[in-house]
């Protein structure tokens, strides 16, 4: 099945407020819609561009618009590179495209040390379109049929409930926080690593966490083994040394918060190769994971969980990383990457098939689109089969029955409303 042509469209989704994390903030979400055509079928994939998350150096060197345009050009490069080829599978295509896209992006951004996450993020829309073509070619109609044999053991769970983790950014509405905490099913993913020097960051993080713990720390939680609310802290690589992180942990211990920490995600810059197995909390890897070798290296350094991002680093790479973590007995979880409804199903399908983390009675999925996008309701309505359909009435959980596990959560359908820009 040879790819004969491609098309690309860009959509800019407005946010309710700036999304602040990793020492910066962005004000709108850019999405690429990628169309790949063969003689037999058409695949349309959406990719959400995450410049600040994937490489802050690009974000800092350009305007918000400029950084997004650079990543969109990498997506265009990858789609064009596929024309005239006949990849055996999406995974084979991504394996070939990733080094090419990374080299192109390094030259484009003039950053020799550009993080591979930038290139992976640019490939998401291309990969999603490839999976639609793959399904059409082989007559596949469910997500279970998409899972390659090598990843089936890693994705053998069948969660019927996922706790939805909203991202609590620096500017999150405290009134909304209180409402969520009262639900009894609240697991906040708190963005730490405030802007400023390391000392300023630490002081602001300590103050903010003290405030949050006083506000919601006693809230009940029906998802944890001991009934207490748990916290998920995400530093996005802002802590430059183990000493600074230990000072934060000492503060959390003093205020009685430490034993309610489920995990801390990506505390150090990805070039930091420190051992973390001696820390008193579970440490998860995220941005520093680009392939299975990175998964194995982080596990060797004591990282206790691997964060997967089907909608941030491609489904193809997610399958490979999930299998690598499972082979070494290390749990995995799924994070959101600011998904619009049309992208949510890609993450939801993976999260629903991972075992629960230690201390949890069900699965989890970070999903912050509801709090982030101005037009969330309209976007969810437009793509009626998307993952947002499974949100509970109070929006704290995804309720997943047998019908969900027998389907695909909309990922094999044209991603409305974005398909209109490339389907003519």
Predicted features along the sequence, with ranges:
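Flexible C-terminal active-site loop/helix
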Residues: 337-424
